[in-house]
Amino acid sequence: SEHIYSNPNTFVRELLQNCVDAITALRNIDENYKGRIDVFLNEDKTVVFRDNGIGLKEEEVYRFLTVIGESSKRDTPDADDFIGRFGIGLLSCFVVTNEITVESRSAMGGQPVCWCGKVDGTYQLTLSDEERPIGSQVVLHPKGDWMHLFEYETFKKILVGYGEMLPYPIYLHYQGEEELVNTPSPVWLDPKATRKELLDYGAKVFQSSALDAFRIYTESGKVEGVLYVLPFRTQFSVRNSHKVYLKRMLLSEDDCNLLPSWAFFIRCLVNA
């Protein structure tokens, strides 16, 4: 895990990605289905990511959780609807924990299943006769070295950073309180948003007012976004940071060579 994922925060992105894809899979069957993601910071120091998506059956758990590189999304007809498809995301959790527990009940039927994997490569799978809602939850027991990541303010900042644009509501639960931490309908992705709304949003994101804002869209790459013109002089050699999203999941805040070198006076928000 540590060789694949250099950033210990990555597990938040990967678990949110799995939640979103599970809900999307169920919405592809029932477009009126209302999905949600719940994240719990518990007093016993466990962290739980829960979704009400499509869930997993026993044979799917064996195939997709116990074999590195297997993915339930890669070869499906609607694969383009999903964020992830490589089947290694769960490994990112082992950077911050020695044990991962996945509890799931499939919308397609079958008994609820519980899979517990450990950092040494061993795992245990059990079936349950207890009633549980459709969907999945992942339970982590953080390592001592990484406990600081699970302090409320720190964890919330990471969660919002990756998830604030995702299309389903994300609720953070802490000390008996529930808080919505994302905006499922962000203004910069709203084609009806006014110029003032775009400028106000850009000022909030980039901590600087812009002279103007321009929408961008490419049909071939299915890329949409907003370009912001900076109101001050910058050096030609300065590389501005941007925000790049993949299906609304934060991918990068680096320059990424998105713009030509002469566009040093531009910052942008992009979703692909």
Would you name each region that the model predicts?
Residues 1-149:
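GHKL (Bergerat-fold) ATPase N-terminal catalytic module, capturing the glycine-rich phosphate-binding loop
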